[in-house]
Regions:
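Helix-to-loop junction immediately C-terminal to a conserved catalytic motif
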Residues: 50
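Catalytic Walker B motif of ABC-type/P-loop ATPase nucleotide-binding domains
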Residues: 157-161
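Conserved ABC ATPase "signature" region
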Residues: 110-128, 179-180
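Conserved ABC transporter NBD signature motif
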Residues: 58-69
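Conserved ABC ATPase signature
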Residues: 132-136, 140
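ABC ATPase NBD coupling module
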Residues: 67-82, 106
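A short, proline-enriched helix->beta-strand linker immediately N-terminal to the Walker B motif
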Residues: 151-155
Length: 192
């Protein structure tokens, strides 16, 4: 099992229990969509899984290792897990291609260039490679962030409302490309 959540409890305050005895298992290469109304805890769950928040009780196990929150682990995240949050955290003075290639090794520059191009194609931004992110729309910045997360080939990709800034036709197109890509690469996807 790639990810296991066992008996998770979490609340923002004593009267606001978001999760009570929550359990989830994610197998390698599987896609799971989290559905629910605004404020129901989808983003909070992704933040708990990534280690950005401490749970009240229970455990989150990724690749056999416990995921600890900030009280016990100063640097959140795991090498084989990436979170694309609703704030995109792009480098504003680096091009789209440089943002996507940020975590790809420079040892083989030709291979890096090919990988960046492949990922830009997945998110439909190949013609924007030399543009600075500050000139992109919110939806385009969102797609750059997804491509950058995919660049490290994580075993688990956490996407927090990844299509929220896209129009309907772009949303469908990106979802199809993204789901096909993660299936081909055997990447597990947890999407809110």
């Amino acid at each position: 099992m790639l990810l296991e959540i066992n008996n998770l409890f979490f609340s923002h305050s004593p009267e606001n229990n978001l999760f009570r005895n929550f359990n989830l298992k994610v197998e390698e290469g599987k896609t799971i969509a989290l559905a629910g109304e605004s404020g129901c805890g989808k983003s909070t769950l992704l933040n708990l899984i990534y280690g950005l928040l401490d749970s009240d009780e229970g455990e989150i196990i990724f690749q056999g290792k416990p995921i600890l929150g900030p009280k016990k682990n100063l640097v959140p995240g795991e090498d084989d897990m990436k979170l694309v949050a609703q704030n995109y955290d792009l480098m504003p003075y680096s091009t789209v291609a440089e943002n996507v290639g940020k975590f790809i090794s420079n040892i083989n520059l030709e291979a890096k260039k090919e990988k960046v191009q492949e990922l830009l194609t997945v998110v439909g931004l190949e013609e924007y490679a030399s543009i600075l992110p500050k000139y992109l729309s919110g939806g385009q910045q969102q797609r750059v962030s997804i491509a950058r997360a995919l660049s490290v080939m994580p075993k688990l990709l956490l996407l927090d409302e990844p299509f929220s800034n896209l129009d309907f036709s772009r949303k469908i197109e990106l979802r199809e490309r993204l789901f096909r890509y993660v299936k081909e690469k055997n990447i597990s996807l947890l999407i809110s």
